[in-house]
Amino acid sequence: SFTPVQTDYVAADFDDVVFEVKTVPSTTTFTIQMPTAETGTGATNDGTLDPLPYILIGNLITTPAYGWGAGTWGLSTWGTPRTSTTVILDPGSWSLDNYGQNLIATVHNGRTFQWIPIAGTAPALTTRATSLSGNPTKSVMSIVSDRDRHLIQLGTETTIGTPSTQDKMFIRFSDQEDPTTYAPTSVNTAGTFRIDSGTRIVGAVKGKDYLLILTDTSAYVMQFVGPPFTFSIRQVGSNCGLFGQHAAVYVDGAVYWMSGEGGFFVYDGTVKTLPCSVEDFVYTTAGDNLGVSFNNGEQIYAGHNSLYTEINWFYAKAGSNFVDRIVTYNYVEKVWTTGTLARTTYANTSVFPLPYATKFTQNIAPTFPTVQGISASQGNTKYYAQETGVNEVDAAGNETAINAYIQSGDFDLDVEGDGQFL
């Protein structure tokens, strides 16, 4: 899609409108769909157009890549499409963090942007984010060290501005109070690290006075220590890798996460395995039980519900391309539950009195913002206020009853058969 700006077209329905590109007939032309059939020649012949393309943020789901270099040497003949590949493309995702009043946003394996809500006299909602100068062009994610105001790029480029040098175990941190300067000098605090336990940094979470960085196999703690080293970094766990970028959450002094190696973990000064009574149900696909989809682990989202002292992990079951299951841990009662609930993201109560979440549905055209020629293939996201009422109420006030049920598994009775309740 693109937004036309600075146009001289006279057709009012063409000016400053977002369009979906329908086809690309050549390297210099593309096709869009107008809201109504043209009755004159204005939109065809008048003026010039400066298109402003949206940023490509990646695939909708984890996708195998079958292009040049897929497979082993000599696997097939020249020019023959490959039917197998070891190259996997991650789904598009974002890491978001505050740098003071500004928002820092990094596309997963992409660029970093900054949104400045107060920029001159322009209203915040009409102000667009812009690419943050001086930053790497390909990083797994970014995170801000609040205590000392460094912007940290994880899984980033060894040569800034050269995407082919991305090293998914390489870490850069900016100069203090300057998120655009990464070159270390004798008078600034910018610097780099490379960690070595694992093959890629998957995600990171802020703790009380540290950052917990999780690879696909291990856990590291990164802490601000001041000059001359700025940061220290040490490995605190192994065989505890993170499943997906958003599969970890900080709660009351500890970080909880779901591992791609099986099981749940917590870091509260040391890495510990979290006992889980439903681990087999969540991880194992056997018979009619469909465990987690390992192919879509990047979609897992961990959310904290402080109203009920719960941590929720939303995940896609085996055979599903999108999130449709939930596993919940009550960290006060130390009780696990599972369920069917599709939530793509989840935000705990903070500024607002209720938790809020989103749900993505495939093959439904979005309704906001208005995009001319939009197709259902783009999918639709709903925004939910959680933990209010007992039914689902849409934006128009239409109420739908939520079907609820309880399902349990086998469990042992007390030897006397007493004290059991359902």
Give the role of each language-model region.
Residues Y9-A12, W94-S95, D209-Y210, A318-G319:
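Short consensus segments that form the blades of beta-propeller domains
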Residues N59, W73, T77, S93-S95, ...:
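Beta-sheet repeat architectures centered on beta-propellers
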Residues T3-G92, G120-A124, G134:
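Small/polar beta-strand repeat architecture
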Residues Q33-T41, H108, I116-I118, Y315-K317, ...:
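Secondary-structure transition/turn motif
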Residues L75-L89, T121-E298, K334:
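Beta-propeller and closely related beta-pinwheel folds
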Residues I104-A105, L211, V255, P355:
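Hydrophobic beta-strand segments that make up the repeating blades of beta-propeller
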Residues F30, N102-W115, P123:
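Hydrophobic or amphipathic alpha-helical targeting/insertion segments
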